[in-house]
Amino acid sequence: MIRNIGSQDRIRRIRTGMGGLDEKLGGGIPAGSTVLLISNQEGPVRLFCQQIAYSLCSEGHRILYFTIVRNPPYIREEMAVYDWDTTELEQGRQWTFIDAYSPRVQALLQGGQGQQSMGFMGPGAMTPGSRALGSDLFVTLRRDILSQLNEGDVVVIDSLSDLLVNHETASVRELLEILGGQIHARNGLVFMPLLSDMHDQRTTATISHLSDVVVEFEVESEHLEGRMRFWKMRRAILRPLLLPFSITDRGVMAETFGRVI
């Protein structure tokens, strides 16, 4: 099981809202952590990120959701299936979609020509809680996430695999080092899904080394259930923890029991 280092009072933890998970993590994820989520299937791990982000936003954390291969309306529709409506949260600036998808698609439609800008999509194309940005993903991340982080903010990078297939691993590593430093200083969280089948072992090992928390999702293809393996966690003495979960009409449900492996 996971044991905290030092007294509980000295370790600030952020509860995910997933009861069985928070219990096994000693009260939640340590604040100031970059969380790498490794899976061979996209659906469950993205659902996990959306569910925790919505729960944290409902508790007062500001969410910056960086989406690369889906536009914000697509993500909203996914979340609406589970009654996670971000409309009011976006209007209140508690939830912001950073849209790196739409500008790239628009550039492709235009043959890659023309200067992209914040307003290229025209009036009314963006809701108050989403920003459509230029095609350079690193510029987008630096300008509209790193420079905007406040205390306790939560960032979702959907997904880290999409960054890695568009940029060199060394460049992504540098970016994650900077992002990790900012998150540590502001006691926030970053969730980074990684689709294991898209990368070699060296790349996965490199990103795992940079991450504060590493979780591997093992999903049974024939059933909507699986196991989470926690291999690494900062500010905790961690023996790899195996936690069963299932996917229900309420999202990802962690079992109230787990076992040490």
Q: Which residues does each PLM region occupy?
A:
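A short acidic, often aromatic-flanked loop/helix-cap motif at beta-alpha or helix-coil junctions
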Residues: G92-Q94, A100-L108, H223, I261
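NTP-binding/hydrolysis catalytic cores, primarily Walker-type P-loop NTPases
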Residues: R15-M18, P128-L133, L141, F245-I261
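A generic structural signal for well-ordered alpha-helical segments
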Residues: L56, M79, I183, I207-S208
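Loop/turn-to-beta-strand initiation segments
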Residues: R62, R93-Q94, E151-V155, A185-P193
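Phosphate-binding/switch loop-helix module in NTP-utilizing enzymes
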Residues: P103-H184
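N-terminal pre-Walker A segment at the start of P-loop NTPase domains
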Residues: I2-G19
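Phosphate-binding/switch region of NTP-binding enzymes
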Residues: G188-L189, P193-V252, V260-I261
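Walker A/P-loop NTP-binding active-site region of P-loop NTPases
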Residues: K24-S102
